[in-house]
Each structure stands twice: as C-alpha cells, then as structure tokens.
Amino acid sequence: MKISVIGAGNVGATAAHRLAEKQLAHEVVLIDIVEGIPQGKALDMYESGPVGLFDTAIHGSNDYMASADSDIVLITAGLARKPGMTREDLLMKNAGIVKEVTDQVMKHSSNPILVMVSNPLDVMTFVAHASSGLGKERVIGMAGVLDAARFRSFIAEELNVSMQDVNAFVLGGHGDSMVPVVKYTSVAGIPITELLSQEKIDALVERTRNGGVEIVNYLKNGSAFYAPAASAVEMIEAIVKDRKRILACTTLLEGEYGINNVFCGVPVKIGKNGVEEILEINLAPAELDALKHSASLVQENCKSLEALLA
C-alpha cells in the first residue's frame, strides 16, 4: 500500500505523520512545490519511527514522479483561509491549484482513490473528479467526518461525557450551509433531545457551523489542521482496512435525496473501493430542505468553474 499526500503544510504533514504512525501503508510520500519542505518534514517524521514504533517508509519530494503507482492520494494543496475570508473566497485560486495537482497525480497513478481536503471542499472534490476521469466512488471529500467530530466534541464538553459515546451526522456542504442532523445525534444511544434543551442544541449546532472560523480567529494566521488531518486519516483507514465504515463524506449525488449531479456530504459506506454505497436516511422536512439548499450553493459555485474545466 502506497499513500501520497499532496501539500506539506500543516494538514498534509500532520496527516502524513499520522498515516505512518498507524502503519496504514508501507510507504508514505509527501509532495510540495516548495523546495526542501517535504524532504525535511518527511525525514523528521521518519526519524520519529524508533520512538513512535513504526517502520513506514516516508519520503518527501517536489516531483510528482515520487507519487507513482499510489493506491490512495490525499490532496491538501491550496491556499489557507485567513481571518475574514470565506471558503468561497478561495474558490477560483484553489480550483486552479487542485486541477493542476490532479492532472499531475493522474500522470503517474492509473486508478488511485482521491481523498480531498482542499477548500472549498465540496467544489474542490468536483474539480478533482472532473479533472481525473475517475469513477465517482474513487473521489471522496472529507467534510462530514470533521464537522461531526466538532459537533461531537462540543456535545461531550457540554454534557461532560466521553466523546466516544457521542454519535452524530453532519450533512451538506462543508461550510456555513452544513446541516447537523439532530435527529440522528445521540449519547450512548440516548437521543440528544432528551439530554439538552432545544436552545442549547441550537447553540451547539451554530458553533459547529462556525467551528473552522473559531479556530481561524484564534490563530490569526492559519487554520485548523489537527482535526482535519485526523478526519482524513479516519477515512483512509476505512479504505485501507476495508472496514465498511458509515461516515458522512462528500460524494457525487445522482438523484439521492432529490439532488442531482452535485458533490455533497451524505452518509456513505467506505471500504476498499472508496464510496461503496450511499445511504438515504429519513430526514425531517426542514433538514431535507436545508440539505438541498446546501447542495444548490455548491452547484452554483461549480457552475462558475465550467470555463476552467472546459
């Protein structure tokens, strides 16, 4: 198993190290355009092996040839958000970056699974799919896993319970229009509505929607990377180990939930073939409307990129 990570910034480097520590591949390759950065970070990670108790080979390069014959490629490349910048502000610049990255990846790997992290996530997943020529099941966006992790952590903090006992789904686009689904949120099987007031739930939902912005505002010059990296690795682990995990991920919808030809976050089964099944769960009318609205915003942004992808 060979996994390449494109982008040696905070998310990419953190994910690469986590992949190595969990020994999910015999080789992890870190690629970046800045000379010395992927090489130095990869060497530093490799030297942590004796202490971290892993034998994964880790290499850094500025040449996409190093990614040749990758089974999975994690794409994190792109510009980071700055305070006051929305994901949509990043749209055109990152779309060009992701198209170029995908073109380079596909020159050297014939049928990889692409896991997308670059923002705006849903639109960048669309760009990667359009540029790669891969089947829709092999291009997956990391959105709901991260958003659900934030929602779960906030609930656990509020109730003073273990995060492991909190289950939640967050659907829709990875942005302000995301849809935390309260109906399927529980703590050790107990519906969240029996444990928290509606007012408190609404506050936690709103905090989840602004989870990325909250961190950006603290950091001033940067954005979240520990949780995004961990979320991407959780998806990759499900693929590598064929675990058939049910996770909320961005995938191409073709009629599911009444949504057509849009990449949007929904519950899917993740295994060795990527997205192996899209699950259509029952949503309250307001939640379904919110999901469709979220998808429509993604579709609008995708249409603005038609010239770039022509």
UniProtKB/Swiss-Prot annotation:
Its EC number is 1.1.1.37. InterPro entries: L-lactate/malate_DH, Lactate/malate_DH_C, Lactate/malate_DH_N, Lactate_DH/Glyco_Ohase_4_C, Malate_DH_type3, NAD(P)-bd_dom_sf. Substrate binds at R81, R87, N119, R150. It comes from the Bacteria. One of its GO terms (molecular function) is L-malate dehydrogenase (NAD+) activity. It catalyses: (S)-malate + NAD(+) = oxaloacetate + NADH + H(+). NAD(+) binds at G7, A8, G9, N10, V11, G12, D32, N94, V117, S118, N119. CDD domains: LDH-like_MDH (cd01339). The keyword NAD applies. One of its GO terms (biological process) is tricarboxylic acid cycle. Keywords: NAD, Oxidoreductase, Tricarboxylic acid cycle. The keyword Oxidoreductase applies. The active site is at H174. Pfam families: Ldh_1_C, Ldh_1_N. PANTHER family: L-2-HYDROXYCARBOXYLATE DEHYDROGENASE (NAD(P)(+)), L-LACTATE DEHYDROGENASE. Catalyzes the reversible oxidation of malate to oxaloacetate. Belongs to the LDH/MDH superfamily. MDH type 3 family. HAMAP family: Malate_dehydrog_3 (MF_00487). This is Malate dehydrogenase. It comes from Chlorobium phaeobacteroides (strain DSM 266 / SMG 266 / 2430). The gene is mdh.
